[in-house]
């Protein structure tokens, strides 16, 4: 049977103009019927030709923290993938900056090995060498003003040599303690001055502060030397195709948006579950915990996309305005609400895929008496016409049963009246599941008659999987985001008000949990779905978590 594929929809590297007002319209226009994936790729020139360069401005990409894990595992592989798909400009340079003494040739040798190690597919040596030829290194202490004097000299030289036209992109792949310091030092040297003829942008990784006051302080420090339009606060979850597709799914399909409200939706679940423990991040995690690490950014950003109103246009500011409205409308919690509507947990020893794993307190760099939560669950409400009375259940945790990130929208059950004289005693509600990772896709469960002389209703699924329709393109989740920063498209990045609104949701919970001490933590065995108290959170409302097995 022929399948319908919207032109340009599912490429994470789709070229975008600086004016993104037609973003979703471009995703869904000119639909065509093709018989299979091969025909789709043949008929869609996007798979064969690079864009015309308008959204690939010359760029000098400066990575602070170039020797770190993020650079190795995410940034370099993403840049390699962009180069492979012809989505980097010819005038492109990478300058790594870090405190480890090393020259450019040594750094190139290291990155050559990193590319080989981190790629799940055979490496194209031509692409690899093209990228390595544009790679340079500067050794220096981030806190030393002399580092920025040498950086200024090197930027001038590389800009002239490679024709990057003064467009500098600074990526903070460092510990959060350096964010404000680096920005201030760059500002002191005039290296973030933004003009019409060239761009200067900064990308900042999470965490954006560790509470509301620190987030405000960081935003203030950044705005002393930068305009808000120059700051790109990155959340790699928003780079995932299935998260981006929520907007298309909602606003490009006439059958879903009319029922996307309190009249038809019973509740929403957002789950980010990991089977991994804290690994080598024990020291960081002791200061953060599951709530700080995941909720103000990943989970609340997904919630905002699910719950936002349609923007007037798909201009970046219009989209970000609507997301901010959702966060602003989340019902604030008082201490009693926190006690009744949140659960904190910590994993103990257990089995993951048949393998014994240590309890959190036995992990490296973790306090043996730690009260840091590795699991967080909560019920949130949104005070709006669309969502009044619809609970949003959020949970995230480590060492859980299955690695899964998904959004579950459960619709209200149909009335039973039609089937009152049949053996049917209950109707299963329709459930829409948006799988963000792994097995990216969307499924919808609905009732169907079981064959036979009696009227019996069973549940069946309509299921869409990205890989089945569009193949398995290499992606780290960073490709789209890096491409968008270079193009000046801030749609998928957090604005300062959204960051602070996220912390305003989390701060009251943190304060109550900290005041409770050991009484706040509920323990769970590794390999389960968290503490029983998380199940009770939904059970008291007559609902259940949707768990994979």
Question: Which residues fall in each region the model found?
Answer:
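N-terminal amphipathic/hydrophobic targeting modules at extreme N-termini
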Residues: 11-15, 23-25
